[in-house]
Amino acid sequence: MAIEQTAITRATFDEVILPIYAPAEFIPVKGQGSRIWDQQGKEYVDFAGGIAVTALGHCHPALVNALKTQGETLWHISNVFTNEPALRLGRKLIEATFAERVVFMNSGTEANETAFKLARHYACVRHSPFKTKIIAFHNAFHGRSLFTVSVGGQPKYSDGFGPKPADIIHVPFNDLHAVKAVMDDHTCAVVVEPIQGEGGVTAATPEFLQGLRELCDQHQALLVFDEVQCGMGRTGDLFAYMHYGVTPDILTSAKALGGGFPVSAMLTTAEIASAFHPGSHGSTYGGNPLACAVAGAAFDIINTPEVLEGIQAKRQHFVDHLQKIDQQYDVFSDIRGMGLLIGAELKPQYKGRARDFLYAGAEEGVMVLNAGPDVMRFAPSLVVEDADIDEGMHRFAHAVAKVVGA
């Protein structure tokens, strides 16, 4: 039966898409830099960045060129073969980090799934089949597959799907004593976000991460850093572990890695990687030439002094605006995070209303995020212009006034 061609509107979403999202009422159709336009031509300043993904803004010329060039050359061949863009990107990541081996996937979930499987398998073949315990943290977020959502410490995402993978223990974030209480020689891995993004934009303390490193060494467990949201320049270092001076055994990256093109990576050492062999894990699309070509172009720009050394000044620009808004409207109890991953916690009288501020922002022409019901989150382009920060925060101030005055 022929399908009648009708206009695409927000109502179309409710008619055809699985109801796992509740998207905004407007549909973005064009982006350039830190600005977005919807179907009606309304302009928005983008401080959401596709949830910390569009690290170089929308339609960056270098990324567009990389995509067009690769798109005219080779799209897909699977991992029955390798390809030049994947090998180039792998070499760049290894040369810039602690890692000696890398594997590419398509999403943060897949990178974390790979990391958790590797940690379990490494413990099994190198130590004992009973060394299976994974220690993770309350309010963590590691993905949506059954394994990764179970390692994530938020029951609202993991309950209701039947039996969960076993031997996963959650303890409070930044509480080293709680980790010590459950850590033993049956532990195969400790999994942690250096900055909890979805969990409220809460940064780990240096003492906490250093303590985790020492405990993992003591119990022959692997330290896994999930840098899906906080990595690729967002903190002002290429990866957050560099800021802390604590080197993990396994690191995962996604989001900003592709600048908007779906791609992820898991990085580790040669010795740990050797626990896997052909067939241990895999992906049809992982390491896709299109994705890796775009990611390589993004990497070449992000991993430069011009970008990384400008992050802190841009952060301060945001913080200055947030402090002025707070002085005027008395709305934030804390402004936190690191680099251009910024959280603004709402005061008690506004608890649970983060989405009200988000929706008001959209009405005023600025796109922001929430991190739970009580925290506003900002994850803009790493090269956002000062004029965009000023204009976007001016609009956000109007949004705050609207909510506070409601």
From Swiss-Prot:
Species per Swiss-Prot/TrEMBL record: Escherichia coli O6:H1 (strain CFT073 / ATCC 700928 / UPEC)
Record-listed pyridoxal 5'-phosphate binding positions: G108, T109, F141, D226, E227, V228, Q229, T284
Residues that hold N(2)-acetyl-L-ornithine according to the record: R144, S283
Protein name: Acetylornithine/succinyldiaminopimelate aminotransferase
Pathway: Amino-acid biosynthesis; L-arginine biosynthesis; N(2)-acetyl-L-ornithine from L-glutamate: step 4/4; Amino-acid biosynthesis; L-lysine biosynthesis via DAP pathway; LL-2,6-diaminopimelate from (S)-tetrahydrodipicolinate (succinylase route): step 2/3
Biological process, per Gene Ontology: L-arginine biosynthetic process; lysine biosynthetic process via diaminopimelate
NCBIfam families: arg_catab_astC, argD, PRK01278.1, PRK05093.1, PRK12381.1
Function: Involved in both the arginine and lysine biosynthetic pathways.
